[in-house]
Every structure is written in C-alpha cells, then in structure tokens.
Amino acid sequence: MSSSLSLLAHLRPRVRARVRPSTIRCFIISQHLHSDASSVAETFLSRFQSLGPQTRMQTIDANQLQLLTLTLNRPTLFPGAPSLSNGAPAPQSAVPVPPGYHLAYFTPAFMESELGSDGTDASYNPDVPFTRRMWAGGEVLWPRLNGKPNPLRVGQDVLETTRVLSAQSKVVKKTGEDMIVVGVEKEFANEHGVSIIDRRNWVFRKALPVPSASTPSSAPPSSSTSHIATPNPTSSVISTEGNTYTRTLMQTPVTLFRFSALTFNPHKIHYSLPWARDVEGHKDIVVHGPLNLISILDLWRDTRQNFVDSTLVIPERITYRATSPLYAGEEYRIVLEEGESTKVEIIRPGGVVAMKAEIQ
C-alpha cells in the first residue's frame, strides 16, 4: 500500500494532500464487507445445493382453502359457488385451488425457538449477519397437461419439491448496503404431474439492532387508525377504461393478522407495530408480498367471469416484483391493463408503484 501511495504522489503531487488515511481505511473495509457478502452467498449456495432437493407431502385441506377465501374477504370461491361464510361448509372434494391460493399450503413448520429475531423462519437463511428477509418477487408457472391446466384440488395428496437455485451478493443502490439475493424454486405435483412451479426471490440484508425503550422512533406516525373491515373485493366496483381494469383495496390490521396466522408467517413486520416502526423503520405494519400477489391474480380472474368454467381460469405464467412497501390502512389501486400480455401495477397513495406484474 505504501509503494502505491508513493507512486501516486510522484505522478500527481496535488492528490496526496487529499488522500486521508480514514478514506483508505473506509475503502479497505468496504471491499472487505462486499467480499464477506460474496463469501456468505457462496457458502450458503454450496451448503444447500449439496443437500439436494427437499420434499414434503401434504393433503390439500378444504378448511384451509375456506379460511383463506374468507381472509381475502371473498364470500365465495368462484362466481356462483356456495357461500363459505357464517358456518357454511368448506369446499367439497376435488374443487380446484384458485391461482395463488397454493401459498396457504406447505407453510413453514418451526418452533418459536428456531425463528429469527424478526420472527422469520430461518430455513433458507444465509449466515449471520444477513438474516433480515424480504420477499422481493419471483414468477409462478402453471404447466399445461394436454393443453389444459392441472390445478391442485381439495383432497389431493401433493408433493412439494424445494430447490435453492441461486445466491448472489449485491449492493443496495441508494445506501451502498450489502445484501444477498436468494432464488428458491418450489414445485407442486399431484397424481397427474406438475401443477405449479413457484420461483421466489428473497433479499437478505443485515439484521438491525433492536432500539432501547428510550430511543425515539424515526419512522412517520402510524396510518392504521381505522379498523373498518376491508370491503368485499368481488362486490366492489371494478372501474374500466378500454382494456384497463382498476380495483381499489385497503388491508386492515385484522386482515394482515389473519393472513399471517393462516400462512403460519410470524414475520413481525406484518403484525407488530413496535417492531415494524421502531426496528425496521416502517410507518406501519406491512402488507404481505404473497397477499399482494394473490390480490393481483384475483383481479385477473374476476375480469374473466365469462368463461364457461370459471374454476379453470388459470394463467400460464405470472412474473412479479415488489418495488415499495404497502401499509395497513392505506387505500391503494390495482391497475390491470390487457394487451398481448396483461400488465399489472399496485399503486400506493401518491402514485408510488408498490408491485409490478405481467401475466400470460
């Protein structure tokens, strides 16, 4: 390092006065941190790929499907189907699972002592300090069988196969913070073959310190002061303009709590305001990424109710990416635009895009 500085001084004498030792140390530390992120990512990928695919078998339960439908504030599973509310029976055997609703199955099964400090399950976490997980996006495919979809159905025994596809170290553009992006693939197969291929991208950032009780919060005040129930999205007006469909929604703390419970998701940002605000820096509890994905798919199939069999309105593929958090109590719009492919945006107050998706 000293010889390099001597050469620099010889070639450009004026520069020497501006090169501080602290600057050099910061550069070395920065390089070391980025190297650590790369090393953690490589170790993680090597460990999980050496383990090979992980498999689980589960029966598609009617009760779980009923509760998810009601959590989404939809009284029926499909247009013209019997009501599922107020003591009504659960869907019958062989009823198809709507697109996206598979997310209520194969939920993580861990004791509380095995969870991370933020409540997330650590089943696919890189090593410390990269343990703060966020659902960044992904894609879901519904393969065709003889030209037709092969949906999961109530009562079927389904095999889930999970593979770790990738782990890459990256840098947050706005802050320069290191992070690791992990790609995971989940394949769901019934007796007829593969029904769903679900590829997810998780971002892992460094865990944040828990502030002391005396530390004031820097987050803006909470917006979830209203506990008015979310309106039934199927009865709400879908405004249309040409090939564009818009639905306005608002998620309440109760809806987020029920969705967390149903999907066995203990991530604290979805139900603990002190954690979301004081530790993570959010202004309120955060709407789940999977809940946003389901809401997009629900709007897509609600615009296709003229199909002969509404139970088989299933896309071939959706790609999606979360771009900004949504909060409880915020009214937001899902805007769907038809074309060669269907493009969807979830738009927060102020015109901020929270999620982008494309459906084929």
Map each language-model feature to its residues:
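Hydrophobic, proline/glycine-rich low-complexity stretches
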Residues: 4, 28-159, 315
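HotDog/MaoC-like acyl-thioester-processing domains
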Residues: 17, 32-54, 137-251, 322-360
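A contiguous, surface-exposed recognition patch within enzymatic or periplasmic domains that forms
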Residues: 36-94, 225-292, 299-302
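Long, contiguous hydrophobic alpha-helical segments, chiefly transmembrane helices and signal peptides
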Residues: 60, 98-106, 134-136, 140, ...
